[in-house]
UniProtKB/Swiss-Prot annotation:
Subunit structure and binding partners: Part of the 50S ribosomal subunit. Forms a cluster with proteins L14 and L19.
Function noted in UniProt: One of the primary rRNA binding proteins, it binds directly near the 3'-end of the 23S rRNA, where it nucleates assembly of the 50S subunit.
Recorded name of the encoding gene: rplC
Domain of life: Bacteria
Protein name: Large ribosomal subunit protein uL3
Record organism: Desulfosudis oleivorans (strain DSM 6200 / JCM 39069 / Hxd3)
Gene Ontology BP terms: translation
Amino acid sequence: MCRGIIGRKIGMTGVFSDQGEYVPVTVIEAGPCVVTQIKTVETDGYSALQLGFLEKKASKINKPLAGHFKKSGGVGFAYVREMAVDDPSAYTLGQVINAELFSAGEKVHVAGLMKGRGFAGVVKRHGFAGGKDTHGCHSHRVPGSIGTSAWPSKVFKGRKLPGRYGNTRITTKNLKIFDIQPETNLILIKGAVPGSNNGLVEIRKINA
């Protein structure tokens, strides 16, 4: 069994459960993904499926990639990712993998690119409390002391300081699948997942 799929975050909404509880969910377009390469222990040292997601114009694909995609049907893809697989022999080149890989109630890990926030201060970037907001205070959102001049006479590596925040890959774990709509390849996941709307996400089974 393939252990994951590529998808695109559509956005967030809310639905009601059978018990009448309002549940915030993230809607993800999961696939359809096409198997573009099959990796085995004998040939590559490990087992995996290379999946292609979102078709791309042939004029936008370079010749090496076009030759690679030709082996799986000739259709080019904008995104290619590898997913672990239990038995590679159960799959063939060009085979389609969709949202039916998962089931409602299953827990998954979702990885994506965090929203980029640019250069940010310590209050926004690290959650510092900030200084006092009283009369006479001139340091409301500054980090404070980062070391003395006598000792250590330097700033230690890893010190929480202002800097570029976001635009990094993060994984949100143990999210529950609320519902699956196979006819539209939509997966409704309880809670929030990383990234902005239309951003690429990877949905993996636990222990993948």
